[in-house]
Amino acid sequence: RTANAVEAYTVENLDITIQVQEDGKLLVFEEYDLNFNYYRSSFTRNITSTYHIPVTTTQGVVYRDYYFPVRDIQGDRLLSVERNEDGSIVTMGEEGMQLTGRQKFSISYTVQTSDLQMPDQSQMLYWTLVTNLDTRVNHLHYEIEMPKAFDPQEVYTNTGKYGDVKNTLSMQVNGNIISGDLLQPL
């Protein structure tokens, strides 16, 4: 982002709910409360399918590429869905209308994850809550329902383009539910 530039919109609030299925399928529901600073024809959400994930091996940290297909995309104000090698581009709005001021959008989709084949036989569930939002996010709340009990000491959260920013998301575990909030605007 450029200093003094007015962004097209601000994410005032984003609620994300993910239900993790036994087979690794993620049922994702996102609710956006946006504030458009000037007229726009649509809101675009990029859903990534390809991940470049760091994995610690006996040779050190190596990066492996994974593909997690995204399916069943639905939205309350869906205009179009385009797919490419990186994922899905979802465009929302209203045909023939310009968006301005406060606007709400919801989207749901399914992500088929897979075993990431970690070297020490551990399992890792990896996903990105928000990608390619080149704007300010004032508040985010997430809730992830796991299919069974897990070790809460093995849950980590971070933000940043490469997941390199620590301590910006709160995280709490209650039974098989992981939840939290953004601690400062992004």
Place the predicted regions along the sequence by residue.
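Lumenal/extracellular ectodomains and adaptor appendage modules
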Residues: 2-186
